[in-house]
């Protein structure tokens, strides 16, 4: 008999035996078995069977427990294992006979339950009292399994397999749980055409991630529910299969295939009433194939797909389709491709307008139409690694979520007032311990202040709570209105015109009036509100900024003034290069004002000039100005790319080469930080092929890396530096001393044009020639270097005073036109820094002292009072 039991039947008998042993019962009875059936880990088939005959499972369990409580128990170390009593043997015999009559090869848990109802004694009486007679249970069992026989050891997991491993989209559409689908009529019509074919009626939706492939299927489900489809598709069910759920928990070899086979049989038995949908269709290739087996889900689907017995809609991305589906031509030819293209910005705005109500109801906030337009436009402009409409929807969702979080958090006014109250309370506790007259007077004043602040805090809190309630009421009314409209639509569809008319002409208009009144009251109160209640374009821009680091928002007054004074700000740090500062400042202002060419980098410059005049320093100053951190730039030393084989490191190694997965040093840095200053230092030392790579960046603001991903450079400022022709500017070259500045620059540009290809130079925004530094500029640079040293000394509470004579000495001694300002930096380090370090370590200069630096004869005096000549 044991060999004929299904897996779950065997588990139930083992559990019943264990229960009898733990209770000390000498006999194994139908009551033990019934409790084991009810308490099994996978007992949903028993639960469904009892529910089908309207039996109360809790009452059955309680009644069976009472039966067990009356059984005699035996204790002791020599107690024999419990043996099946006469009633249990009769139950098993009855169950075996019924299985034979039904043509089943195995004895399932349902057979045992029916056997208990027929011959289970006291346990059978418990079932009968709840209306679960053997006859009723048998009828329900036959109806549930739908004519299928028990031919495997795990038949219980195969009943209602489609319900278990699928999601009914048409049921979700009928309940109004799906979002509206806008602007995909052509794709839905194409899917309907393919589904209406006689054979190979299997469309596969192909498109980039986030363009709305699943939404097309949801739109089809909504059309089926509305009846807006051809006769061949009317009243059909659209069920999404979950292959992951089928694979999950499949412990034994062949269990996944058994589950899939059962689902396919159920679909086939529906006689064309079920259309299946598999999202991520590429997962069927290889799913379930274990060990050396070639029988995966794809191969199991092929025969039914070819004969037209299975109408399936698939969805997958272009890359996955190419990599997985196209490699199996037999599977590919059974599907008809339907391309889902990325919608335009205008179409995305229409989609967002259709979804606006759902997001307003969910977040209980208002969303301005201008915010939807901003979401579509800004996501298209700045979030280039993803696709519309998904990225625009995410922007709106996150902006609304952020606003909702702000509404639920304390406003700044209340937060600040609460901190003041807490501080006053702590002060009150401290002063309360003092007994002198002045302290008592101070305490009285403090208590009056505290009472006033607490009163003000209570008033503000009450006002904030009232505003929140008003806001929440509007959100709740919108949610209720959405629900009633869904009910009215369902009532019309089901032909319940009485309910539909009550909703359409009674409840819905009344609710709309309430909503209008609440919205008007809220608008009136919004003129002097503490909480913002509408998502606007600035909120969308803030989210874009937090995702990408790009300041896409409207210019604030403070930032406007800062940009207008950009030359002055950069000029504080970069001395004597006004032309270069002007060119860079103009590029940044063009972008922030929104008038720059959106298809090119923010700016691309070639900085030329002798060493040490500020080419690299300007890039650092610009990064500091834009990001408040001079390290926030992508710096690549082009001398590392002098050999041909190193060029690939910029964009990443091609497939098949070591390092392919790592990506390129330039492309990865910009992909992670799309709004940045990119500094390509000493570009003349790079291999000529580097410039071929840079052509696309300079012209179109894009570069394709080694893995085929397009990296967006449109929000970067590209700065290339070079020392070419510097001999004409430094005074150490062939140029005559009386040569004018213009003539020197012309000579430099001639050298540059001879060294770089015309197509490269022609794509740059500007060639900026840096001048050699004069004596006055070196004095200002010396002052900058001294200020930086003073900042470092301030951390040790040391104050630095440098006389004008000392600055003049530094400028004179550090002046070397061939090397720019770098000798001056070294001079400050040796003449002041090194001497000061010795004096600090020797204890001559202590924390809190003022250090004076002055010129004396041929050197400097450094120290708190007087020092030695250097």
Swiss-Prot record:
Tell me the segments the record calls region Repeat 1.
5-71
Q: Where is this region: C-terminal?
A: 773-870
Q: Which GO terms describe its molecular function?
A: ATP binding; ATP hydrolysis activity
Write out the entry's keywords from A to Z: ATP-binding, Chaperone, Coiled coil, Cytoplasm, Nucleotide-binding, Repeat, Stress response
Q: Which domain of life is it from?
A: Bacteria
Question: Where is this chain primarily localised?
Answer: cytoplasm
Domain Clp R positions: 1-147
GO BP terms in the entry: cellular response to heat; protein refolding
- Subunit relationships: Homohexamer. The oligomerization is ATP-dependent.
Please report the name of this protein according to its UniProt entry.
Chaperone protein ClpB 1
Q: Which organism is it from?
A: Streptomyces avermitilis (strain ATCC 31267 / DSM 46492 / JCM 5070 / NBRC 14893 / NCIMB 12804 / NRRL 8165 / MA-4680)
